Amino acid sequence: MTTSLPFVLANHGFALNFNVFETNLINLVLVIALLVYFLKGFLGGILERRREAILADLKDAEERLVTASKALEEGQRELAQAKSTAEKILAEAKQRADLIREDGEKRTIEEMARIKQDANANLNAEAARVIEALRAETARTAIDKALAALPKRLNDAKRAELIDRSIEALG
């Protein structure tokens, strides 16, 4: 008994065969039912283990995400702290460099003042030495002239009188 339901598409005939024995539908349903019955535990166990593994992987991934997020936050915080520390060190270095430069300038000015003072002292000492040398030379010249002129001006009586006065002044 062949029952067909014609279904026409684009001038071609198409028919469905509803004969259960001819289409082997009972055998197919029976095989599928037996497979489901016998393999349900096996496939169910495999699927359950697979589901648990996937859930464990998801949980592990979530934990790693949380850990990575915390590590990222900590890293960002440490980076910000490192930047702050670096800026602080840079500011301190600039301040120290300015202080060193100012100290160097101050020392240079002090050294220049000391050198100038030493030069002035040397100049004054040299001027005093030259003045003293000129005085000594002038005195020597005056004494030489006086000694040269003295014998012409002094006679024996004046010489004796000069010697006596000198002795009285000493004595």
UniProtKB/Swiss-Prot annotation:
Family: Belongs to the ATPase B chain family.
Gene name linked to the record: atpF
GO cellular component, as recorded: plasma membrane-derived thylakoid membrane; proton-transporting ATP synthase complex
Xref: PANTHER family: ATP SYNTHASE SUBUNIT B, CHLOROPLASTIC
Full protein name: ATP synthase subunit b
Entry's localization field: Cellular thylakoid membrane
Main location: membrane
Subunit structure: F-type ATPases have 2 components, F(1) - the catalytic core - and F(0) - the membrane proton channel. F(1) has five subunits: alpha(3), beta(3), gamma(1), delta(1), epsilon(1). F(0) has four main subunits: a(1), b(1), b'(1) and c(10-14). The alpha and beta chains form an alternating ring which encloses part of the gamma chain. F(1) is attached to F(0) by a central stalk formed by the gamma and epsilon chains, while a peripheral stalk is formed by the delta, b and b' chains.
Keyword 4Fe-4S attributed: no
NCBIfam families in alphabetical order: ATP_synt_b (TIGR01144), PRK07352.1 (NF005606)
Transmembrane region(s): 26-46
InterPro entries: ATP_synth_B-like_membr_sf (IPR028987), ATP_synth_b/b'su_bac/chlpt (IPR002146), ATP_synth_F0_bsu_bac (IPR005864)
Bilayer topology: Single-pass membrane protein
Keyword line: ATP synthesis, CF(0), Hydrogen ion transport, Ion transport, Membrane, Thylakoid, Transmembrane, Transmembrane helix, Transport
Family annotation (Pfam families): ATP-synt_B (PF00430)
Keyword Amino-acid biosynthesis assigned: no
Function: F(1)F(0) ATP synthase produces ATP from ADP in the presence of a proton or sodium gradient. F-type ATPases consist of two structural domains, F(1) containing the extramembraneous catalytic core and F(0) containing the membrane proton channel, linked together by a central stalk and a peripheral stalk. During catalysis, ATP synthesis in the catalytic domain of F(1) is coupled via a rotary mechanism of the central stalk subunits to proton translocation.
A molecular function (GO) term: proton-transporting ATP synthase activity, rotational mechanism
Organism: Synechococcus sp. (strain RCC307)
